[in-house]
Amino acid sequence: VVGGRVAQPNSWPWQISLQYKSGSSYYHTCGGSLIRQGWVMTAAHCVDSARTWRVVLGEHNLNTNEGKEQIMTVNSVFIHSGWNSDDVAGGYDIALLRLNTQASLNSAVQLAALPPSNQILPNNNPCYITGWGKTSTGGPLSDSLKQAWLPSVDHATCSSSGWWGSTVKTTMVCAGGGANSGCNGDSGGPLNCQVNGSYYVHGVTSFVSSSGCNASKKPTVFTRVSAYISWMNGIM
């Protein structure tokens, strides 16, 4: 996350760290959201290579054991059949991970609330992106979970020339466009949007501009969760 600040520990209790095995260690690569006790929602581009994965729930500082973590292995990966790794702008950047064990819910580990099917946010809806991604373009990952204020940008604005143009589809959500943004390592994580006083995960972090994570008029682009509710229900 570029901009924003370090989150209060465990204040986004559905946020997970998706990690891959290399040698004898695991490394953070993407975020995700716990949506059932045995299921995580993330981005397709995070899991479209064959690796050994694990999911860490209740995490805050990636390098410190704070006692709230639950570490889960991944039983199976379900990538949307429409996903094409050569065309992230084509959409369908969503995947479900079936965990080998059920999460125990507590103050640090909670299920994300998902929006009703096909709900569209108005322009400038209050949202936060959360993640351990890079804190500047080409910079280091954040040890601690960060959050940044990222108000939604409606499709008409986001798809206009000078913004993202035709790269952005109606199955995506844009948010930000100013100094704050997602960045590499935030992918798959949530866009947490406030609707009627509660937070719902309206987006799965998908891509940013190649000219910089927080390039002007290039808001962070998310898979629109409300477009895939029936797809997810058909798998879980």
Swiss-Prot record:
GO terms for cellular component: extracellular space. Keywords: Calcium, Disulfide bond, Hydrolase, Metal-binding, Protease, Secreted, Serine protease. Residues 1-236 form the Peptidase S1 domain. GO terms for biological process: proteolysis. Ca(2+) binds at E59, N61, T64, E66, E69. It is found in: Secreted. It is an enzyme of class 3 (hydrolase). Pfam families: Trypsin. Optimum pH is 8.1 at 22 degrees Celsius with Suc-AAA-pNA as the substrate. GO terms for molecular function: metal ion binding; serine-type endopeptidase activity. Binds 1 Ca(2+) ion per subunit. Its EC number is 3.4.21.36. SUPFAM superfamilies: Trypsin-like serine proteases. It catalyses: Hydrolysis of proteins, including elastin. Preferential cleavage: Ala-|-Xaa. Its cofactor is Ca(2+). Acts upon elastin. This is Elastase-1. It comes from Salmo salar (Atlantic salmon).
